[in-house]
Amino acid sequence: MIISSYHLLAPRCRRDQKVYNKSIHVLNTVAKGIKGWPFLGSAPALAAVDTNGIIGIFKSWAEQYGSITQFSAMGDKQVILTEDKDARELFVRRGIKYSDRGAPHAVEYISMKQNPGFRPKDDGWRRQRSMIQSAINITSINKYQSLMDDEATFTVNALLQSPDSFHGEFLRYSYSVLTSSLLGFSVRSPSDPFIHHNETFTAELMNSFRPDCFPSNVFPVLRKLPMWLLPSLRTMERLRKEYVGEMWAFRRKIEKLVKEGSATECIYKHFLLHRDQYNVTEEESVHTFQAMIDGGTRSPHNNLLTFLFLMMEFPEWQKKLQEEVDRVVGRDRMPSYRDIPNLPTVRAIVKETVRYRSIVAEMGIGHCLQTDDIYKGYFFEKGTVFNAIFASILMDKDTYPDGKLFNPARWLEPSYPTYKEPLTTYPNCQGFPAFGYGRRACPGVDFAERTLVIMFAKLGWTMNIRWPRDEDGNELREELQYEPVPAPRPLKFGCRLEARDADRAKIVEEAAKHLKLQ
């Protein structure tokens, strides 16, 4: 489950040496009045900024040059797409041509081109994708949905006991809903060694996308230097060894438990017991499980934190959420998955939270063109990398008339172009651009949506979400800011969580006592 990652300045994929002169507007400036360097193109400017800065640069270029803008970096061509219709035409309808990858050098080196999110479109990638889809299908059965429901109840109860711990508890929840179904164990504390170790490594891995941290991503000549001469190359080698070592160590641990008969029911156990049903290689399988862990934990955590902030910033929507869950569920029990079809406002807030976060802090994963193509009269050379810019796509004026505003009503009211019926099914996140396009769309969107919707519903039923106050009773408002990395998390902010009433708190506490978590 590679949920909404980031691609930047990657080498052209499987290109030949043929050179073409016909092309779209070639961007020679990194900003108005500044020319790109000969051969280097825009690489120096892009290498000097972090992810958030690059999103801003791409948006400004698109505003200056149009919805399809081409630039070069070290001779490699890249294209910026800022309209959904163009992204769907190329990535979906012409997906057979536009589904390759050309990951940044550091990412390819560390993952050895085996991570299915960044791997080139080859037979191995197809096998891995099939394996991921099988895993997602397994999690949709009632048994695993019950695990998600229980994990959400555990988390809400923990927040009632320790309201200031929401950053850590949401992190624990994001891990535990995945580990309980995928790996066969729950994590009961944000300080669990599994979380700590994986978070430490993932933080370093996310930096491997950044050209300011790994200059070999944009300057190929640096890849030829000896490791002792360039610290970032030594870091890449260390991360590669850790990445491989941890994956195989965990695999051996699960195999041992299965052999002893003590392994808990989970997807990893199912895979090992039914190995003949999967045609992935052993190496592909361990990389696939690691990719599901990395992608499946980061996105829910990011969106849960964003949700809290938005409920403080837009209290009218918190009130609407609470009114809906009260009307549908009542006061005597917490929401469950059987209520979800009757909670369109909850689902609308989930989808709008994902949209809102994506427009301020996310880019699409680059799609690499596998063969020459012509679109809208423009010629594109094989190996060109196309970047869908969510900050523009999800604010398209025709589709999102008030795009800068957090407004879940756009999914609920017929006056908006995004409205769909029936409301027992819509809104949902299937096919939503924030999760990618075509063959490279996130295969875990359904899992991610189920993880979020049950938690949003339970939080709305149980708690009031408010700005913290100082000793004089004044609200301590903040601006929402994100990390400068791919799939960024919100930076630390304050929030005041309180039970809506004592009866609800008691119901949650009693339910938590009877949980049978793994």
UniProtKB/Swiss-Prot annotation:
Cofactor: heme
SUPFAM superfamilies tied to this protein: Cytochrome P450
InterPro entries: Cyt_P450, Cyt_P450_CS, Cyt_P450_E_grp-I, Cyt_P450_sf, Cytochrome_P450_fung
Stimuli inducing this protein: Expression is induced under hypoxic conditions.
Positions contributing to heme binding: C442
The enzyme's E.C. designation: 1.-.-.-
Keywords: Heme, Iron, Metal-binding, Monooxygenase, Oxidoreductase
Phenotype when the gene is knocked out: Abolishes the production of pseurotin.
GO biological process: small molecule biosynthetic process
Name of the protein in question: Cytochrome P450 monooxygenase psoD
Biological source species: Aspergillus fumigatus (strain ATCC MYA-4609 / CBS 101355 / FGSC A1100 / Af293) (Neosartorya fumigata)
Lineage per the UniProt record: Eukaryota, Fungi, Dikarya, Ascomycota, Pezizomycotina
Primary gene name: psoD
